[in-house]
C-alpha cells in the first residue's frame, strides 16, 4: 500500500516499547531521518469482527500523526482492498480525531482522501484514555468512540460492490503507529 512503501523495518525497538503494561510508540527525527514507531498484527481478523483499541496521546506533538487502522492482507494494490482508519489525529485540528474509510470506489486510482467522519466534538481531548472501535460486517462498518456510535459506512450493494465495499473480501490486520513529519 501507499503507506508501507515509505517505511522500512529497522533493527531494534527504539521507538516501540512496553512500559508498565502499556505499548508506547514514539517518533523522532535523527540526522534528518524521520523514525516512526509502529506495530502491526501478522494475522488478519475476519469479517463479522469488532476491534477495540484503548489509546491516548501523551502530548500534542507538532508534526505528529498517530493512527489506529486496518489494512487487508493479500489484497491487490491500495485502495482496492480498502482501508479502515479507527482513529487518526493531526496537529491542524488538535481537539478532533478522524475516522476514515478508503476504497477504490471512493479514492479512484490515485486519490488519497477517503470518506471521513470528523468527531463533531470540537473539545475532544486526545490526551485522555479513549476506546476506539469498529465493527465490520457484510452490511456495514460501524465506528465507536468510548462505546458511543460515531458513524456508519454502509455496503450499497452496487454492481461494482467489491470496489465500494471490499471489507469482507479479505482478513484485515491492525496497525498502531505514530509517525512524524506531516504538515496537516
Report each predicted region and the residues it spans.
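GH16 jelly-roll
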Residues: 1-184
